[in-house]
C-alpha cells in the first residue's frame, strides 16, 4: 500500500473529553476529505493523547496540494477549539521507560537522546 501520513504534535496532552471530541471531528473530516472531487481513503485519530495522526491510502487516489491544505486548515481550527498549538515543530513525543510516550521539547529530547547514545558508545568502547 502506498500511504502518506501527517503527524501534528500538540503543546500539551488532551483530556479524555477533548480526545473524544477530536476523534469524532477527525472521523467526520476524513470521511468527507476529497481531492479534485474524488474521495480519499483515509483515517485520522489522536495519538498518545497529544498528537493528531492522519493517514491516506494513495493507491487509488493521491492527495493533492489542495487536499493537504485542507488538513492544515482542519488542524489549525481544531487547535483553536482546543486552545492548542499543533504547528510548533519543537514539540515531540518521546518513548519513556514505561513503554508510554511523553511530550517534550525537541531541545530537551535531543540532549537526552545524545546523552543516551554517548553512554551506549562508552559501554561498547569499554568492552575493548
Residue ranges of predicted features:
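Short N-terminal secondary-structure initiator segments
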Residues: 1-7, 123-128
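Glycine-rich, often proline-containing surface loops adjacent to acidic residues and nearby aromatics
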Residues: 2-7, 48-57
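Surface-exposed, low-hydrophobicity interaction/linker segments
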Residues: 10-38
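A general structural signal for well-ordered alpha-helical packing
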Residues: 19, 23-26, 51, 72-75
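Short edge beta-strands and adjacent turn/loop segments
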Residues: 38-51
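Short, flexible active-site-proximal loops enriched in glycine and acidic residues
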Residues: 41-43, 81-91
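Helix-adjacent hinge/juxtasegments
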Residues: 54-55, 59-84
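Terminal interaction module
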Residues: 86-128
Amino acid at each position: 500500500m502506498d500511504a502518506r501520513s501527517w503527524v501534528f504534535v500538540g503543546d500539551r496532552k488532551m483530556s479524555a473529553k477533548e480526545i473524544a471530541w477530536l476523534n469524532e471531528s477527525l472521523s467526520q473530516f476524513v470521511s468527507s476529505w476529497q481531492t479534485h472531487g474524488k474521495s480519499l481513503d483515509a483515517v485520522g485519530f489522536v495519538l498518545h493523547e497529544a498528537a493528531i495522526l492522519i493517514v491516506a491510502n494513495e493507491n487509488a487516489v493521491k492527495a493533492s496540494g489542495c487536499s493537504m491544505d485542507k488538513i492544515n486548515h482542519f488542524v489549525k481550527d481544531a487547535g483553536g477549539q482546543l486552545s492548542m498549538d499543533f504547528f510548533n515543530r519543537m514539540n515531540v513525543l518521546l518513548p519513556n521507560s514505561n513503554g508510554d510516550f511523553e511530550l517534550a521539547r525537541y531541545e530537551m529530547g535531543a540532549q537526552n537522546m545524545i546523552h543516551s547514545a554517548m553512554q551506549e558508545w562508552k559501554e561498547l568502547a569499554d568492552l575493548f
